[in-house]
Curated annotation (Swiss-Prot):
Gene name of the encoded protein: bna4-1
Domain of life, per lineage: Eukaryota
Keyword terms, alphabetized: FAD, Flavoprotein, Membrane, Mitochondrion, Mitochondrion outer membrane, Monooxygenase, NADP, Oxidoreductase, Pyridine nucleotide biosynthesis
Protein name: Kynurenine 3-monooxygenase 1
UniProt pathway annotation: Cofactor biosynthesis; NAD(+) biosynthesis; quinolinate from L-kynurenine: step 1/3
Reactions performed catalytically: L-kynurenine + NADPH + O2 + H(+) = 3-hydroxy-L-kynurenine + NADP(+) + H2O
Function text: Catalyzes the hydroxylation of L-kynurenine (L-Kyn) to form 3-hydroxy-L-kynurenine (L-3OHKyn). Required for synthesis of quinolinic acid.
Biological-process GO terms, alphabetical: 'de novo' NAD biosynthetic process from L-tryptophan; anthranilate metabolic process; kynurenine metabolic process; L-tryptophan catabolic process; quinolinate biosynthetic process
Keyword Disulfide bond appears in the UniProt entry: no
Species of origin: Aspergillus niger (strain ATCC MYA-4892 / CBS 513.88 / FGSC A1513)
Lineage of the species this protein comes from: Eukaryota, Fungi, Dikarya, Ascomycota, Pezizomycotina
PANTHER family for the chain: KYNURENINE 3-MONOOXYGENASE
Enzyme class: oxidoreductase
Essential cofactor(s): FAD
Length: 475
């Protein structure tokens, strides 16, 4: 068992997975969580806005499988609902229409799961490790990066003094409103770009017994807003209304909630949600704003590193928030922190790259940990900034793109090439993001390259058609 001590702030899914990675490596692990034991697996708090249904995709599944916890990924997947595409609902000529759009031509699926379900599975896995200690109802009150000392206060016992704990590495996994990030900014020159998007959301529930298919996500898109429904294993559908703030304010002031849903989301009420229940849910459930956070760097020396929403909070429209956080954990440990366990070979591995950069090779484990955390920031930041942007773009695509002919033409061409000419390596952007684990920077590079090729082919065909028309006129 190693004496290296890792303190993790935040016991949500990303923090819990980081705890598993650290525990499997024999580190002494302490996890501090502000909420009650398992309260986060029972309900979302009013301020947390964590109740949006989650989807596991390949990046997250790979991180679970690489945790070295036998059968963990399979146990979690057994509690999910596989979804193979979207079903777009609309009204055409006064008739309700539904169109299924598969995510992937190869039949791959996303896996819908509640935040509470996956959090509980990870916390239960952690409880089996003797080198892991979890402290609930503890808030981070202070952080001394120089002395590597954190101060926590038990908020269930406010009369008791705060207690200090030493660490070798502190991992901040405490979400978008990260206290770790706040204290880190006192030491590191962190650039933080925080933007409240004009996107509010409200959760609604479609009771079990409905006739909607459970193997897809359901959408009712409009130009400026949309309704989204995700299946739960209990047979219900968790819905989220996404709209600008002015839409919510208008609905609250006018009270015309039923009329709004009947006009814009055909088939919802009274067929799926009784009108009185719809009004009750809309009025009683909170209306949350959405935030986009991007920061850099993610670390300070060899003392602290941010992961998950603490480093990069994104809107949920690509379903990659948790998956990206899980991928943070895998990359941080496998590609960087694991190297500290073999200091001499680590120095050997670094020698060539340092010689090429004409830099002096660090001569202590602490200096090398600091260097690799710096490299982690440089490696990871471009990727997560891209997925933050892609998530925002996908909100526009979900509302408007699904009705555009150009969207479906490109999708069909790319899927045809992916299926019938796999040697070309062609794939849709969605497949590269959700069903592959290539870097997001490489995803964007490939998608742009494919777009340029398709544009060149389209313009060439148009030019050829024009020339043939001219030739036929002369003849």
């Amino acid at each position: 068992m190693s004496s290296y001590k890792v303190v993790i702030v935040g016991g949500g899914p990303v923090g819990a997975l980081a705890g598993l990675y650290a525990a499997q490596r024999g580190f002494q692990v302490e996890i501090y969580e502000m909420r009650d034991e398992y309260s986060q697996v029972q309900t979302a708090t009013a301020f947390s806005a964590k109740s949006i249904s989650l989807t596991l995709s390949e990046r997250g599944i790979k991180a679970l499988r690489h945790s070295q916890c036998r059968g963990l990924a399979e146990r979690i997947l057994s509690t999910t609902v596989p979804v193979y595409g979207r079903m777009v609902h609309s009204r055409s000529k006064k008739r309700l229409t539904s169109r299924r759009i598969a995510y992937d031509v190869h039949g791959q699926a996303l896996y819908a799961i509640s935040r509470s379900e996956i959090n509980q599975s990870l916390l239960e896995e952690l409880s089996a490790f003797p080198n892991v200690h979890i402290f609930y109802k503890h808030r981070l009150n202070g952080l001394d990066m120089k002395q590597k000392c954190a101060t926590f206060h038990n908020i269930s016992r406010p009369q008791e003094p705060s207690h200090e704990t030493k660490f070798d590495l502190l991992i901040g996994a405490d979400g978008a409103h990260s206290t770790t990030r706040f204290f880190l900014s006192r030491y590191a020159k962190i650039n933080i770009n925080q933007k409240w998007e004009d996107i509010f959301w409200c959760e609604l529930t479609i009771p079990a017994g409905h006739a909607l298919p459970m193997d897809c996500l359901h959408m009712w898109p409009q130009r400026d807003f949309m309704l989204f429904a995700c299946p739960d294993k209990e047979g219900t559908l968790t819905c989220n209304l996404f709209a600008p703030e002015n839409v919510f304010l208008e609905l609250k002031s006018s009270g015309r909630i039923v009329e709004f849903f009947e006009k814009n989301f055909p088939g919802i009420t009274p067929d799926l949600i009784p009108t009185d229940n719809l009004q009750k849910q809309f009025k009683s459930n909170l209306h949350h704003p959405m935030i986009d956070i991007r920061c850099s760097p993610y670390h300070y020396q060899d003392s602290c590193v941010l992961i998950g929403d603490a480093a990069h909070a994104m809107v949920p429209f690509y379903g990659q928030g948790m998956n990206t956080g899980f991928e943070d954990v895998r990359i941080l440990f496998e590609d960087f922190l694991d190297q500290r366990r073999s200091f001499p070979s680590w120095k050997d591995n670094l020698s060539l790259s340092y010689a090429m950069q004409q830099k002096e090779l660090p001569d202590t484990p602490q200096a090398i940990v600091e260097d690799y955390l710096e490299q982690y920031t440089k490696y990871r930041q471009p990727d997560v900034h891209i997925i933050n942007e892609l998530a925002l773009q996908n909100y526009r695509e979900l509302r408007q793109g699904v009705f555009k002919m150009s969207y479906h033409i490109r999708k069909h061409i790319e899927e045809f090439l992916s299926l019938h000419a796999p040697q070309l390596g062609w794939a849709t952007q969605y497949r590269l993001v959700a069903f592959e684990t290539m870097r997001y920077t490489d995803v964007l590079r490939q998608v742009r390259k494919q777009g340029l090729i398709l544009s060149a082919v389209a313009w060439s065909c148009l030019l050829l058609f024009f020339l043939l028309c001219l030739l036929s006129l002369r003849l």
